Amino acid sequence: MIVAITGATGTIGSAVSAHLREMGHEVICISRNRDRADVYWNPSEGLIESQGLEGIDAMIHLAGESIGNRRWSKRQKTEIYSSRVKGTELIARTLSELDSPPSVFLSGSATGFYGDCGSNQIDEKSPKGSGFLAEVAADWETATTSAEEAGLKVTHLRTGIVLDPQSGMLQKILPLFKLGLGGKLGKNPRRKPSPNYST
């Protein structure tokens, strides 16, 4: 199987890419870094080398500005939003225009879709919540519409913050906890979905 992936160098994407290769699948890395890219793209400029996607079996779209790298200034919130929504619109439109499109499009989303639910239990049928991340996630999912209309099977992957000591949020806060300087993460009671690579 030939699988194209955006965000292949991120926390989730690098693990998914490695797993797919171990299973014998071919992975096509879609990246803004020409040195790493099998297929180059620049979503902020609406550019993608679409010919490199002809004949793929599946598309996994995980790219987007990290929500935990910087303070959420107005500019950073715009980057978080546009990197997800505009990037997804570009991927979906490109897939819908291919002569030989994939049958499956797995597109990133987030558990932020549900907003702050406190200790309430939620599942994929739960309604959209309120707040910035809920709006981002809802628009992110809507951005796949052109691919759905073209007949691709679209699945939205609503993931939480992945806890990995080698990258992401945990890598940043772990040294503080090891020094005894850690504290509560968020207000209580609160559920935090924390996927790991085995899920």
PLM feature spans:
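N-terminal Rossmann NAD(P)H-binding glycine-rich loop of SDR-like oxidoreductase domains
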Residues: 3-23
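SDR active-site strand-loop-helix element
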Residues: 6, 30, 59-63, 105-111, ...
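Conserved glycine-rich Rossmann-like NAD(P)H-binding loop of the short-chain dehydrogenase/reductase
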Residues: 25-32
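NAD(P)H-binding glycine-rich loop region in Rossmannoid oxidoreductase-like domains
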Residues: 35-36, 40-90
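Glycine-rich NAD(P)-binding loop of the Rossmann-fold in SDR/ketoreductase-type enzymes
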Residues: 79-87, 128-131, 135, 139, ...
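Conserved Rossmann-fold NAD(P)-dependent oxidoreductase catalytic core, especially the SDR/UDP-sugar
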Residues: 89-131
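Active-site Tyr-X1-5-Lys
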Residues: 130-154
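NAD(P)-dependent short-chain dehydrogenase/reductase
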Residues: 148-150, 155, 160-196
